[in-house]
């Protein structure tokens, strides 16, 4: 019998909002390539993620992983905080 390999989608981004209760908004940057001209350009997408302990703050670099749908817009949860935000930048 084959064992199921659990590979969940993992993304890294910057926390842009932590105002909601147990929810953060993470901006994830990706580089895409134009099919005709082959020029690379940056694309930013925002994802709502579940932060159970409310430990992430604005400006933190975090890793989020896919999970079952938690609400209408939340399909990710916070896995770990890779780098804390600097005091003067991002936090108010």
Curated annotation (Swiss-Prot):
GO CC terms: cytosolic small ribosomal subunit
Cysteine pairings via disulfide bonds: none
Pfam family, one: Ribosomal_S17
Keyword rRNA-binding: yes
Keywords, sorted A to Z: Ribonucleoprotein, Ribosomal protein, RNA-binding, rRNA-binding
InterPro entries: NA-bd_OB-fold, Ribosomal_uS17, Ribosomal_uS17_bact/chlr
One GO MF term attached to the UniProt entry: rRNA binding
Gene Ontology terms: biological process: translation
Keyword Methyltransferase: no
Subunit structure: Part of the 30S ribosomal subunit.
NCBIfam families, per database record: PRK05610.1, uS17_bact
Role summary: One of the primary rRNA binding proteins, it binds specifically to the 5'-end of 16S ribosomal RNA.
Family designation: Belongs to the universal ribosomal protein uS17 family.
Protein name according to UniProt: Small ribosomal subunit protein uS17
Taxonomic source organism: Mycoplasma mobile (strain ATCC 43663 / 163K / NCTC 11711) (Mesomycoplasma mobile)
């Amino acid at each position: 019998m084959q064992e199921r390999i659990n590979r969940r989608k993992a993304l890294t981004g910057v926390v842009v909002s932590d105002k909601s209760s147990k929810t953060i908004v993470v901006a994830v940057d990706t580089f895409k390539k134009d099919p005709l001209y082959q020029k690379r350009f940056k694309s930013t997408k925002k994802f709502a993620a579940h932060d159970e302990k409310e430990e992430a703050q604005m400006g933190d670099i975090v890793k989020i992983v896919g999970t079952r749908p938690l609400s209408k817009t939340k399909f990710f949860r916070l896995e770990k905080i890779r780098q804390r935000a600097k005091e003067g930048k991002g936090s108010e």
